[in-house]
Amino acid sequence: MKAGIVGLPNVGKSTLFNCLSNAKAQSANFPFCTIEPNIGVVNVPDTRLQTLEELVKPERVLPATVEIVDIAGLVKGASKGEGLGNQFLANIRETDAILHVLRCFDNNNIVHVDGSVNPIRDKETIDIELQLKDLETVEKKLEKVGRAARTGNKEAIKEKEVLDGVKNALEQSKNIRSLELKEEERLEYVKPLQLITDKPVLYVCNVDEAAAKTGNAYVDQVKEAVVGESAGLLILAVSIEADINELDSFEERQMFLEDLGLDEAGAAKLIRAAYSLLNQQTYFTAGEKEVRAWTIPVGTSAPQAAGVIHTDFEKGFIRAEVISYEDYENYGSEAKVKEAGKMRVEGKEYIVQNGDVMHFRFNV
C-alpha cells in the first residue's frame, strides 16, 4: 500500500515527508532537491492497538503501515520530459494514491516557482501534466482497440466506446477519478491502464500557523475547486509539524499542540486519511507473543483476511473466531469475552469488520 506525495517545487512536500517518516530527505529552497524518490514506511496511528497492548501485554506490537513516497518536484512540460518529468510520472504511476500538497500560505522568504502564491494555478499545472500523460496512454490503447473494432469485434467496439469517453474527458482537462462510469466498465477497461488521474487523491493544503485550525482564503479556493472531484482535503501547517518533529517526548508534543489549540498532530490525521483514501481497514490478532494490526481492503472475506497472514491460512480456512474490538475493550480479556458468550464463530462468507480481533482455524 503506497501513497505518493506530489506538488510543485517549494510547496513543503519534502518537509512533510520528513515529518511523516523522520527520514531526513534533503529539504532545500530550490527545485529538484528530491531527485530519487524517498520512501518511508509509516505506522498508522491507532489507539485501539495501544489498548490491546495494555490488555494483552504481548512480547511485541506491530502496527499497520503505509508506504509514503516523496516524488521529485514537477514543473510545466513534465509530460514531455521537462525538468524531472519522465521520472516523476513513472514514480507516481507506481503509487496507489496521491497526496497532492498545495501551498496555501504567504512567505516572501520561500520562493514560489511561478513567482506568486496561487494554489488553484498550482493544482491545474500538475493536473494538466498528469492528464496529458494519461491521454498519451489512452491514445496508444485506442490505436490497438480501434484496429480490432474495425473488424467487427463486439468486445473491442464496447471498449473503444468507453475509452473514447475517457479520451474526451482528458481533452476537456477532467480527471478520470471524477468521470461517471459503470463499475464494470471502470474495472474492465480503465483500471488496467493504471491512469494517474484515476488514482484517489487527497489535497493537502499547507497553511501557516495562524490558519492551522480553520484554514484561510486560499483553502476556501481549493475547497471550491475540488467539489465534485471525488477527492479528500486536509488542512495542515507543515511548519508546525516540523516543530513537533523536533520535540523528544510525547508529553512535550502534546503540550505544544494544546498551546496551539490542536487535538493531535496533523501528520497523524494525514496518515489515517491516506489509509482511508485507499479504502483500507484494520483487523487485529492478539496473543501473548504478539498483538498485530493487519491491513485489508473494506469488504474482505474471512478467508481472504486470513490469507494476508499466510496463503496457507486462506487455502485451508475452516473458520474464524471473532471478537469485536468494543467487546474486547469492555470485557478486558479474551477469556472474559468467551465467558460472556460474545465470541462468534464465523465461516467463509463472513465479511471482516473494521477492528475485529480474529483467530483463524485452518487445515494445511
Sequence positions of predicted segments:
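Conserved G1/Walker A P-loop phosphate-binding module
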Residues: 1-111, 139-140, 145
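C-terminal-of-GTPase-core extension/linker across diverse P-loop GTPases
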Residues: 2-6, 11, 17, 144-351, ...
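Short, intrinsically disordered, mixed-charge
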Residues: 22, 54, 90, 94, ...
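Short amphipathic alpha-helical segments
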Residues: 28-29, 110-114, 215-217, 247
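Amphipathic alpha-helical transducer elements in NTP-driven molecular machines
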Residues: 32, 46-49, 62-68, 82-95, ...
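Conserved Switch II/interswitch segment of TRAFAC-class P-loop GTPases
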Residues: 40-45, 72-82, 93-154, 169-183, ...
